[in-house]
Regions:
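Bacterial N-terminal signal peptides that target proteins for export
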Residues: 4-19
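Flexible loop/hinge segments at secondary-structure junctions
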Residues: 32-375
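N-terminal targeting and processing segments of secreted/endomembrane and organelle-targeted proteins
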Residues: 2-4, 20-21, 32-35
Length: 375
């Protein structure tokens, strides 16, 4: 080959190599920046909502992270109302709520939202009576009158009628309730609306009812704290919070007329009563169930997700995490005072998880839920 041709090719090759290096340089830095964001391919999920499920959700997040080190899940325990609000605003990938979203809420959401039941829990009455050792019992009528402000002392005749062999203290009774938007409140007021016509008419049900009386506490944690540090109080919390704080739990008279303690069997029995009546969208209330051994203030906890996920890595990780929660994750329920899903509900929840869809390619696993674009 003539020398000038070799020289021309040499110079051309050098220019091409320089141009190629300049062309790929931004891409190389972009790749490094993306790698730093996702920490070598890490997928980040952001969730928020129910304080009811928080002890179990934190356990799930920890255990799933051990199984899938590339997945980071952050769950903020801000109350079901807050979780639903953030999900509708698309600032989180999933919400969690102790009750199903209302039809109005679903219609106002910017996309189709799926309800995926992941666990069962109990709302309990707990109290602080210094020096009092007996376990108390409450009928539905008595509970309604306490929270309506009609019963103001612990030795009221209605409480005495529910506890005939107990010497009740002659002390003022103080109610503690949630101050934030709360699925726990929604479950409790749903129950009260079923058992008390006066409650249904005067107050009704919801995440933020207009309480007739009482002190407010933020989250299950706040209500538990108020009761623990304030003598002669009574309030409602998720079972795990009462047990963890060594607070007494009352027996509640159920629809069949039996006084029932919340536990694995009685909460599961409440769910079993409602399986056949559960609609296709899985939004169901299981309070005041009819079974003789059913605890009357029980509820599913739902994880709420958009059916259409814009980022495939987020969509796939959501499906993997939720599938694990309703299967292997159920073994962590009982030690934390929750009840596992009935087998039939596991099957139906799996069907909902399978409906989550996402594109085949694209995304980096750090999607901004609000915009649908990658960070």
């Amino acid at each position: 080959m003539p020398r000038f041709i070799r020289h021309h090719l040499y110079k051309t090759g050098r220019r091409f190599a320089a141009m190629f290096f300049i062309a790929i340089l931004p891409l190389s830095f972009a790749g490094c920046f993306s790698g730093r964001q996702s920490r070598g391919g890490q997928v980040k999920l952001q969730g928020a909502g129910s304080t009811f499920i928080n002890p179990l959700m934190q356990k799930w997040v920890h255990e799933f992270g051990n199984l899938e080190p590339s997945v980071k899940i952050d769950y903020q325990s801000i109350g079901s109302g807050g979780g639903i609000k953030q999900l509708k605003e698309k600032t989180v990938h999933f919400g969690a709520s102790d009750t199903a979203m209302s039809t109005e809420d679903l219609r106002s959401a910017p996309g189709e939202i799926l309800h995926i039941p992941v666990i069962l829990g109990a709302v309990v009455l707990t109290y602080n009576l210094p020096g009092f050792e007996s376990r108390l019992r409450f009928s539905p009528e008595t509970i309604a009158d306490i929270f309506l402000g009609k019963i103001t002392r612990w030795n009221d005749q209605k409480i005495a009628a529910d506890n005939p062999s107990v010497a009740l203290p002659d002390e003022p009774l103080t109610v503690v309730h949630r101050s934030d938007g709360s699925g726990t409140s929604a479950v409790f007021t749903n129950y009260l609306s079923k058992v008390s016509e006066e409650w249904k008419t005067r107050v009704g049900e919801g995440t933020s009812p207009n309480w007739p009386i009482g002190l407010g506490g933020k989250g299950n944690e706040g209500v538990t704290g108020q009761i623990k540090q304030t003598p002669n109080t009574i309030g409602y919390v998720e079972l795990a919070y009462a047990m963890k704080n060594k607070l007494p739990v009352a027996e509640i008279k159920n629809k069949a007329g039996n006084f029932i303690l919340p536990n694995f069997n009685t909460v599961t029995n409440a769910a079993a009563e409602a399986i056949s009546e559960t609609p296709d969208d899985l939004r169901v209330s299981i309070t005041n169930a009819a079974g003789p051994n059913a605890y009357p203030i029980a509820s599913y906890v739902y994880v709420l997700v958009y059916r259409e996920q814009p980022d495939p890595r987020i969509g796939k990780t959501l499906k993997d995490f939720l599938t694990w929660c309703i299967n292997d994750g159920q073994k962590h329920a009982q030690p934390l005072y929750y009840s596992p899903l009935p087998a039939e509900m596991v099957k139906r929840a799996a069907g909902k998880i399978a409906m989550i869809s996402y594109p085949e390619t694209g995304g980096n696993g750090n999607i901004n839920p609000a915009s649908g674009t990658n960070n």
